[in-house]
Design a protein with these regions (language model features):
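Short, charge/polar-rich alpha-helical segments
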Residues: 1-10
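Non-transmembrane amphipathic alpha-helical segments
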Residues: 9-23, 40, 47
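N-terminal processing/targeting junctions
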Residues: 22, 76-81, 117-119
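Short, charged, amphipathic alpha-helical segments
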Residues: 30-39
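Long, charge-patterned amphipathic interaction tracts in eukaryotic proteins
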Residues: 38-108
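Charged, polyampholytic interaction/assembly segments that form long, compositionally biased interfaces
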Residues: 88-140
Length: 140
């Protein structure tokens, strides 16, 4: 598995989502960009479903076994902030897939690039539950 390619494709997807997020609905280019984004999401899901699904299954099984895993793009936030000085992306933690545990706590699971990783966020905490730097580790 080329995590370098996954990271690059994730960044391309994020850039498309950011571009659409910044565009007004009445912009003449909005519909075309939205179509391009959906096409890219379909390609991303086809390309990475078989690779990412086992990771997501492990995470869901450990953190929220009653909630089935979704397609990879469901875990990509709608908007990211790019920080050029560190070449990283941040999200505000309000996007991604919601996981609820039995104690009534809500968490969100979100993909972030550079390096590719899955973040588990709550209103109080954020932790990396999977990273390309430690791909075979058990879910934390």
């Amino acid at each position: 598995m080329s995590y370098k390619r996954l990271n690059s494709d994730l960044i391309d997807l994020i850039e498309l989502r950011n571009e659409l997020h910044a565009m007004a609905f009445n912009d003449p280019q909005y519909d075309d960009l939205e179509d391009d984004l959906h096409d890219y999401e379909d390609t991303f899901n086809r390309r990475y479903q078989g690779i990412i699904a086992p990771i997501l299954i492990r995470i869901h099984k450990k953190l929220a076994p009653e909630i089935p895993h979704l397609i990879p793009t469901a875990y990509v936030a709608n908007h990211y902030e790019y920080l050029a000085e560190t070449d990283t992306y941040e999200t505000d933690g309000t996007s991604g897939v919601v996981l609820e545990n039995g104690a009534g706590n809500n968490f969100r699971l979100t993909f972030v690039p550079n390096p590719t990783r899955l973040l588990l966020t709550s209103s109080k905490d954020m932790q990396v539950v999977w990273s390309e730097n430690q791909p075979d580790d058990e879910t934390k």
